[in-house]
Amino acid sequence: MNIINEHISFGDRRLVGQEKAKHQIERILLSDRLAHSYLITGPDGSGKTAFSLALAEVVNGVNHLTDLKDLTISKKSSWFTHPDIHVFIPLPSTVGSDELQSRLELLAKDPYEIVDFTLRPALNDAESSKNRRAFYPIDYYHNEIRPKSVYKPNEGRRTVIVLTNVDTMRKETANAFLKLLEEPSGNILFILTASQPDQLLPTIISRCQQIRLHPLSKDEVAEGLINHDGVDKNDAELLARLSGGNYSTCRFLDIETLQQIRNESVEFLRFSYTQDVPELLNLINNWNKNLNKENQIALCNTLEQLLRDITVYRETENESLITNIDQLDVIKKFCTSMTEARLEEMIDNIQQLKGLLYQNVQFKYIGTALSLRFTRLMRGLDPAIDSESSWKHLPALIN
């Protein structure tokens, strides 16, 4: 029996966007020539985990994320209950078995749930900022992952092992895993995901067939929110504009909070330009105290989009190209005031410092450093501290 036919659309019940990657997977499945390992890469929130779970289900005939019609071969309701599908996520240094199980249960309910310990340290506390860097320790590999690789399929076509965020593997674990990739059994299928494939051993990449996902467009994010999350069209469009292509994260955002963030991001630029230190410190400290990580990332995306709108309008004066059209008056005023502003460098600084949020650097340090840099870049001046001496800025911001 074929895995799929031309009447089946991969991931049609849940996957958001990524039509090119979907068609690539459909061609693979139609050819009936599965590789032993696939590496799904793409930015955070683009759907890597959802794609890996959907692929695992289709290979073993589970009619869930994809409507398999008459090609269903499993009676199981999803990958979560299938005996031949094993899913692993990176773990922090201390974690209970119940805690891991609860995250997999969440993922079973929705493949776009954020279950990464680094991004979401606690499931029951949205405000938690506890540092829980997660990775694949060597004993996790030897005790949990490798034993599953010798299992023969019980009822499916393959024993499928899904490893999310393999770019967090320590060198010792990566070398051990490489040996497994080099000598796979005929019945095993590895599906790996990575946001930063450049952090992987080149030999691991060479052993996998790659499937690349791109940042989701604003329309794709909005469509996902409307169709799968029941979000109002206007709210979905606002969330999508501020998502940075990250569908997973924007599902956690509150509309009222986002509206406040939009207004305060304008104040941040204004205070940075006027060098109003008391107001800046008050604003930054409030963000550090009251915004969780998802909202802090949304704040960075808001600032970035606002600066892109200022850039576009300064170059074209074409209102139809502005994303935040309701803030057109603000954009025009900034263009008039900041005629020498080095906007691209300001955007680069946001992207650079946003990465530190994922490393659990406190926002009060990030916001302070950003405002100090903006003060000079807005005037067309070099930052007071050059990029080669970033350690002088704040100890927390060492590159």
Predicted regions and their residues:
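Charged, glycine-rich active-site and insertion segments that engage polyanionic ligands
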Residues: 1-79, 186-189, 195-302, 306-399
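Clamp-loader machinery-focused feature within the broader ASCE/P-loop NTPase space
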Residues: 2-172
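Conserved adenine-binding aromatic site and its adjacent loop/helix in ATP-hydrolyzing domains
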Residues: 147, 179, 202, 206
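Structural recognition of the conserved hydrophobic beta-strand(s) that form the central parallel beta-sheet
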Residues: 160-164, 177, 188-194
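Residues immediately C-terminal
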Residues: 168, 183, 199
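Conserved strand-to-helix beginnings and helix N-cap segments that scaffold or border functional pockets
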Residues: 171-175, 297
